[in-house]
């Protein structure tokens, strides 16, 4: 399927080989599939930490025929999905750290003055008009300041 081709293109040959080795360890009968019960164990072995709820959701999505087993291609799709989720969570933590640094007075918001300070500190020359424009773009609820959710939305466009 398209999903399977996309999953393979996201991974290096080494990663695919590593995933295959882990998968094969649990494919006891060599039939080319593993049970959903074994799935969590394999994922943890490969450095993923899915919760019970995440595993249930993953299994529901991946085990389309309801057989209770997952083949290697379905497994690859699922691992890539999990890796992307983990990466997203990490970048959100990094953005939270940035937000705390920018929010000089620690009131939970970035105002125009704090935004201007950020640019000045980075050696970037920006006019008051540019600051105003950035504030207007980021301040979705028009309260004159940028909260964390607005900051995340702003940064999505940057990455």
Curated annotation (Swiss-Prot):
Binding locations of Ca(2+) 2: 63, 65, 67, 69, 74
A Pfam family of this chain: EF-hand_7
Top-level lineage group: Eukaryota
Residues modified as N-acetylthreonine: 1
Keywords carried by this UniProt record: Acetylation, Calcium, Metal-binding, Muscle protein, Repeat
This protein's GO CC annotations: troponin complex
InterPro entries on file: CALM/Myosin/TropC-like, EF-hand-dom_pair, EF_Hand_1_Ca_BS, EF_hand_dom
GO biological process, one term: skeletal muscle contraction
Domain EF-hand: 14-49, 50-85, 90-125, 126-159
Sites where the protein binds Ca(2+) 1: 27, 29, 33, 38
Gene3D superfamilies documented for this protein: EF-hand
Positions with a binding annotation for Ca(2+) 3: 103, 105, 107, 109, 114
SUPFAM superfamilies: EF-hand (SSF47473)
SMART domains per the UniProt record, alphabetical: EFh
Binding site for Ca(2+) 4: 139, 141, 143, 145, 150
Gene Ontology MF annotations: calcium ion binding
Family the UniProt entry places it in: Belongs to the troponin C family.
Functional description taken from the UniProt entry: Troponin is the central regulatory protein of striated muscle contraction. Tn consists of three components: Tn-I which is the inhibitor of actomyosin ATPase, Tn-T which contains the binding site for tropomyosin and Tn-C. The binding of calcium to Tn-C abolishes the inhibitory action of Tn on actin filaments.
Note: Skeletal muscle troponin C binds four calcium ions.
Protein name: Troponin C, skeletal muscle
């Amino acid at each position: 399927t398209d999903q399977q081709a996309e999953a393979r293109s996201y991974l290096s040959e080494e990663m695919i080989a590593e995933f295959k080795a882990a998968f094969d360890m649990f494919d006891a009968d060599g039939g080319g599939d593993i049970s959903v019960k074994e799935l969590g164990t394999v994922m943890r072995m490969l450095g993923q930490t899915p919760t019970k709820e995440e595993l249930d959701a993953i299994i529901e999505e991946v085990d389309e025929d309801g057989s209770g087993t997952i083949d290697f291609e379905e497994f690859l799709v699922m691992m890539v999905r999990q890796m992307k989720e983990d990466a997203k969570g990490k970048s959100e933590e990094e953005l939270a750290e940035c937000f705390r640094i920018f929010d000089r007075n620690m009131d939970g918001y970035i105002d125009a003055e704090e935004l201007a300070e950020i640019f000045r500190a980075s050696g970037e020359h920006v006019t008051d008009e540019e600051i105003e424009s950035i504030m207007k773009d980021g301040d979705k609820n028009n309260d004159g300041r940028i909260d964390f959710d607005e900051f995340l939305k702003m940064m999505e466009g940057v990455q």
